[in-house]
Amino acid sequence: MNRFDDIATWLRSSPGRVRVSGSGSRAHTLPKITDATPLHLSQYNRIERLDAGDQTCTVECGVPRAELDAALAEHELELPCLGGGTIGGLFATDPFGPAAAGCPGPRNLLLGMEALLASGSAFKSGARVFKSVAGFDVHKLFVGSTGRLFVATKLHLRLKPRPRTEQWFANRALERDQALQLIHALRQEAQAEEPPPLDKE
């Protein structure tokens, strides 16, 4: 039996509107709805697959971001976008966009998904690995939709190697051109650093 069959059955029998939630970390950003039935997904929190070689993974919608980050760190990988809460909620709200200039946005990190419509009907879109898929990328519509279109149950994600170092800065007094010059200088400085020597066996 599919772990999400109970949700599909509930959706088929539930009248009216449904409010989907994970950890509830972004509930304050949504408009209040008094006549919606809550659907909590935080218990669906398995990391189903992590392929370090292909730099992809499959997770259930309720996996906490912190737990996924910890699992990826063991393989020197990361999900290069900002935000916490659950993975399903992170992609449904897309609160921050790309983590930095030149990084892929959440839409580009979402390779595919399994999902449920409000009627309880299940469907799949995209793929588990990074490759061309014929047809319309329905799963891309999930990013930023706040769960209005369908419920994502599993997400197939594209990963990236973790950077060797990170450098953050903030300065409200900088003008745009000054900020761009500083970013350019920091990148040149990082590129000039010698990589650590490889261990010889």
Predicted features and spans:
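Short glycine-biased active-site loop of nucleotidyltransferases that positions the nucleotide triphosphate
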Residues: A27-I33
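Conserved nucleotidyltransferase catalytic core and NTase-mimicking acidic/glycine-rich helix/loop elements
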Residues: T37
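Single-residue recognition of alpha-helix boundary sites
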Residues: I33, A99-A100, R158
